[in-house]
């Protein structure tokens, strides 16, 4: 069965309706805030299924105008319930009217890099699948939208136009909370993901490129036969799953700045809600009906949460709402077509569908343009081997004739040499592929009139001059370092103590360069200090000393042979007894008089131990010595020993460095 039969006149009519200024791609809006777009809703009333029912009873729905309808109130028969929507299509409306009035206007947003979605909603047997698919004589929304979209893509990709447009399709169904690929039924259950920008995607979903309507039919018709359908009391071909046709429109700009746009069109045929008491579902049909009703119930919860402005929207409660996250409250231009039946036996289903549709029109979406720049738009340019070599490698690669050659002009660096030096040093060790991209970008900027420094295009002789300047600066830095070391040696010689005073003062040994202790390293520049500060340092050296204890053997690996033993000096910090006694007294005073907060400032004392110390002190009085902490329940002797090591030196040093 072909979807194209008897549609050629309508196709020409739609193509002429979409041509003109209304189809132009929007040039602005990239830097502005995305405008708000309300979900547009339309209601379609199908005719009676047979003439006998139409002759026996009146319809429970009556049209008021092209946007309003009224339904009999089952509570009060003398009153009616009135509803107003964006569009209302009566039982005599055609597929062409529904498509042109509600669906066709949103197709232009796809060429602007925005998303759009069309949802068919309603109870079972209300005509949703007929609205979306139709028949060969009356094609529905899906074939009409694909014909127009492919026509727009061909016009936009014509020779001389700035954009190259491609179209691809995917087709899936949600059956019993499983996402199944209708183009590849053997792929199994797929997962729904969300990227860093909040876009919903399905990894592993088959994507088929299409260039004509024949390509679309070739993929779509066999895939439609894979959709789950079944017979119930109310519908002989009831859809047992939600079907989603995803059409992706990619646009690539042919000229600079080589922008790329991506628009997606979701065409969704929802399964209808069912009352199992009337459908007589049993077994697998009952299980399918439960999954359908659950997903539609979550869909209603999502709409209510969006209307109430709740902080959490339950998109993840079902696969359907997760997939529709972009269509409801997301970034898509959405159209909801609610299908209802005129028979009185469908009255409750009709009221439920109309109430859901009325709530859905309050949902606000925020469409935006999905636009990016192509990172690989520039053609790579290969560099020669000499251009990729750094300064040292270039010098080694030069022959003796090249080294000896030179001219007076080559010794003069350009005025902007200081700006090029650091950049050339970075470029010399850069990845070759990145260098190719940089060179391509530089040539592009040069063609646009850029005044940047052409580092990679500098002549060979000028680059040699710059490298020579870099080497001269490195030699000058080495000379400055040697001069600094000489100045440091002179300062240390002036500060050396008199040999006659050596017998009366303790020797202070400097640790070797390999010693990694807590002693601060000497400054590497000459500093003139006042006499009072030097005197304080000499007095402090009598309190804390770093003594050499003797050689200590250490095994070190050798590159030529096995491990070799090496003697290293062993150092030990020695503190004067007076300073230790003062620190111990200060620590004991803090244990006896400090509050719990002050005790927590000590090392190895937390909230629990501080409370234990305060409680023990209240029961037994003050501590006579610091070692009495062992008597506190929960504090062992090892903990007291580590407590002393952690706090004695810091308290003594703080007291010693404080004001006298």
Curated annotation (Swiss-Prot):
InterPro entries: Hlx-hairpin-Hlx_DNA-bd_motif, Kinesin-like_fam, Kinesin_motor_CS, Kinesin_motor_dom, Kinesin_motor_dom_sf, P-loop_NTPase, RuvA_2-like. Kinesin family member that is involved in spindle formation and the movements of chromosomes during mitosis and meiosis. Binds to microtubules and to DNA. Plays a role in congression of laterally attached chromosomes in NDC80-depleted cells. Residues 505-516 have a biased composition (Polar residues). Ubiquitinated; mediated by SIAH1 and leading to its subsequent proteasomal degradation. It is found in: Nucleus; Cytoplasm, Cytoskeleton. This is Kinesin-like protein KIF22. The keyword Nucleotide-binding applies.
């Amino acid at each position: 069965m072909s979807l194209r039969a008897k549609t050629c006149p309508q196709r020409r009519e739609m193509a002429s309706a979409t041509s003109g200024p209304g189809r132009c791609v929007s040039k602005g809006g990239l830097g502005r805030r995305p405008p708000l777009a309300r979900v547009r809703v339309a209601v379609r009333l199908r005719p009676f299924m047979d003439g006998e029912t139409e002759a026996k009873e009146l319809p429970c729905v009556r049209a008021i105008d092209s946007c309003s309808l009224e339904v009999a109130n089952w509570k009060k028969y003398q009153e009616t319930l009135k509803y107003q929507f964006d569009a209302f299509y009566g039982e005599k409306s055609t597929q062409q009217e529904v498509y042109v009035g509600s669906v066709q206007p949103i197709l232009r947003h796809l060429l602007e890099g925005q998303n759009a979605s069309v949802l068919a909603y309603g109870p079972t047997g209300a005509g949703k699948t007929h609205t979306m698919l139709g028949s060969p004589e009356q094609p529905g929304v899906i074939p009409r939208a694909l014909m127009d979209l492919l026509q727009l893509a061909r016009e936009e990709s014509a020779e001389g136009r700035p954009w190259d447009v491609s179209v691809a399709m995917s087709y899936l169904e949600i059956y019993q909370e499983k996402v199944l690929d209708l183009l590849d039924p053997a792929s199994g259950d797929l997962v729904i993901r969300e990227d860093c920008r909040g876009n919903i995607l399905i990894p592993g979903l088959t994507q088929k490129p299409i260039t004509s309507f024949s390509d679309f039919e070739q993929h779509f018709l066999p895939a439609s036969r894979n959709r789950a359908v079944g017979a119930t009391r109310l519908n002989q071909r009831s859809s047992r799953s939600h079907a989603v046709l995803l059409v992706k429109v990619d646009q690539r700009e042919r000229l600079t700045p080589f922008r790329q746009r991506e628009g997606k069109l979701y065409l969704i045929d929802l399964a209808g809600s069912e009352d199992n008491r009337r459908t007589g579902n049993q077994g697998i049909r009952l299980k399918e009906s439960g999954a359908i009703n659950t997903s539609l119930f979550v869909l209603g919860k999502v709409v209510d949460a969006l209307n109430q402005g709740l902080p959490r929207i339950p998109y993840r409660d079902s696969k359907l709402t997760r997939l529709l996250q972009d269509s409801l409250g997301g970034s898509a231009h959405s159209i909801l077509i609610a299908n209802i039946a005129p028979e009185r036996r469908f009255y409750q289903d009709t009221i439920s569908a109309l109430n859901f549709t009325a709530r859905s029109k309050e949902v606000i979406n925020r469409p935006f343009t999905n636009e990016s720049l192509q990172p690989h738009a520039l053609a790579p340019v290969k560099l020669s081997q000499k251009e990729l070599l750094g300064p040292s490698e270039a010098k080694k690669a030069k022959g003796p004739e090249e080294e000896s050659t030179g001219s007076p002009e080559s010794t003069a660096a350009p005025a902007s040499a200081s700006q090029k030096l650091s950049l050339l040093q970075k470029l010399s060790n850069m990845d070759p592929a990145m260098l190719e991209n940089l060179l391509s970008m530089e040539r592009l900027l040069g063609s646009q009139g850029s005044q940047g420094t052409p580092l990679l295009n500098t002549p060979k002789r000028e680059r040699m001059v710059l490298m020579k300047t870099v080497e001269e600066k490195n030699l000058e830095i080495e000379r400055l370092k040697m001069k600094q070391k000489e100045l440091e040696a002179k300062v240390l010689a002036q500060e050396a103590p008199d040999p006659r005073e050596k017998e009366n003062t303790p020797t202070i040994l400097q640790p070797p360069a390999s010693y990694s202790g807590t002693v601060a390293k000497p400054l590497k520049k000459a500093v003139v200090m006042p006499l009072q500060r030097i005197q304080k340092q000499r007095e402090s050296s009598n309190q804390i000393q770093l003594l050499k204890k003797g050689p200590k053997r250490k095994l070190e690996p050798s590159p030529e042979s096995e491990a070799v033993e090496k003697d290293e000096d062993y150092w030990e910090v020695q503190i004067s007894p007076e300073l230790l006694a003062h620190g111990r007294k200060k620590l004991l005073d803090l244990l006896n008089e400090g509050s719990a907060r002050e005790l927590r400032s000590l090392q190895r004392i937390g909230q629990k131990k501080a409370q234990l110390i305060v409680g023990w002190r209240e029961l037994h009085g003050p501590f006579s010595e610091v070692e009495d902490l062992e008597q506190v329940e929960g504090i062992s002797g090892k903990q007291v020993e580590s407590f002393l090591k952690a706090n004695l030196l810091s308290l003594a040093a703080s007291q010693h460095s404080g004001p006298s």
